[in-house]
């Protein structure tokens, strides 16, 4: 009996408990199960946007994790981020409550669907969202489970009525190779999650399995602008693969005539599919988000749309309806005619892409780029230390904060300060500064921001919460400054 069929019978699963339900991947699966009619609850250490959203749907949320939270549950769902010393896991093991990994639960949801799985080191969330928009524009209503909040829906997951399911496939612990997908997307492959894989070749091998595990009637979509992906594609002959890129003239789908500004990107597309005679040109495709990396993400979506015969009109309409993803180059405030952006970039390649986009926009406005970066995880900084030293070239002024641990134990010699020191010693950046307190960002903006500037707040930790408070903080500072000025003026009058 499959999970999606159980509700057609009298069989019940009882209560399904999610440990860490506030995580973006866990919350999406919990929401879909709830919408399917299953009884869902969960716990997390802190309240956030996802826990509040789920609670508003009637899902019981425990803040804090304790063994009594799973008193009456039948199944426990965990992700790889949950420590085995967690009291709820210990209690589940003690009582022999079945523990299901997040990827296994996702696989069950995908099993009866024609599934599109989007993987890669970067760009998964935006690509998943773009593909979903194209499906809807084509008159299909897919079920979507994403790794970020889709602005069109104000959620990261929603239940559709068609036979399609589109999901972000997390490669962090190799469980993505077990997802039963019909269409597989690989956006890029970079050294990441090496604390799990230990060796980059093992990570590449996992992506190979991701493609070769497809059924014979499925297909993969791969970006061959990325040299590791190109080599992988060249080595696989047993599955159909559609390639895309900007720089790769031999790609099946290529973007050209590219123009970008602060709000959008416009480009033409040349399509030359395998075993199809002739070439198709689609002119003036517009996506309402800037950046070369987002053009690449849209090419992956176009590949799926073309292969499934959506039609050019549906593809263009789908992109026009796209409203972006939370924390992907999201404007959160303005100050002194400078734009403040919140972005999820936390890997060197993501940082380079985000800053390149910001630099392009700043140059058009005669402005500069001010980057404020919060490193995420000691292990990531350790494994990619040299890459982090080199990825901030497009920042005119750079501030690096303390490392956001994300539950990790500190590693000796790996700090935000040590990263800045090494960058300075090796002359990789002459305006790199260590920022001990995020609160000092307000004064940094006040002292440095000018018309046309792009201020980029980056990281996967709590820097986003701070970025989203900047509008209020800067306004409060202005009010305080004006009050001080008025007080001084009144004092002079009284004298």
UniProtKB/Swiss-Prot annotation:
Entry EC no(s): 6.3.2.8
- Give me any GO biological process, just one: cell division
Reaction(s) catalysed by this chain, per the record, are:
UDP-N-acetyl-alpha-D-muramate + L-alanine + ATP = UDP-N-acetyl-alpha-D-muramoyl-L-alanine + ADP + phosphate + H(+)
One Gene Ontology term of the molecular function aspect:
ATP binding
Using the UniProt record, give the first listed, main subcellular location: cytoplasm
Coiled coil region boundaries = none
Pfam family, any one: Mur_ligase_C
The superkingdom of the source organism is Bacteria
GO annotations of cellular component type: cytoplasm
EC main class here is ligase
Q: Which pathway does UniProt place it in?
A: Cell wall biogenesis; peptidoglycan biosynthesis
Family to which this protein belongs: Belongs to the MurCDEF family.
**Function summary:** Cell wall formation.
Which protein is depicted? UDP-N-acetylmuramate--L-alanine ligase
Q: Name its species.
A: Rickettsia prowazekii (strain Madrid E)
